[in-house]
């Protein structure tokens, strides 16, 4: 199982956000929809975790087996 850092305060009302990985530090995170910077290193070099499904909710992440780390 992989850890996902979830930036709760940045998500929309239904806890939906963009699931991205930073190409510089490797961090996997759920950030605000349309976010452009890594929450760890502030790099703007982000890539979708899944090109076919950029937006996820916290329950969807849990159902997929991810470990949620709230930030």
Q: Which residues make up each language-model segment?
A:
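Short, flexible, glycine/charge-rich loop motifs used to bind or transfer phosphoryl groups or to couple energy/partner
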Residues: 11, 27-28
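Residues immediately within or flanking Cys/His clusters that coordinate Zn2+
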Residues: 17-19, 35-38
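Cys/His-rich microdomains that often coordinate metals
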Residues: 29, 45
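Short, intrinsically disordered terminal segments enriched in charged and Pro/Gly residues
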Residues: 1-18, 47-71
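Short cysteine-rich clusters marking metal-coordination/redox-active sites
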Residues: 22-25, 38-41
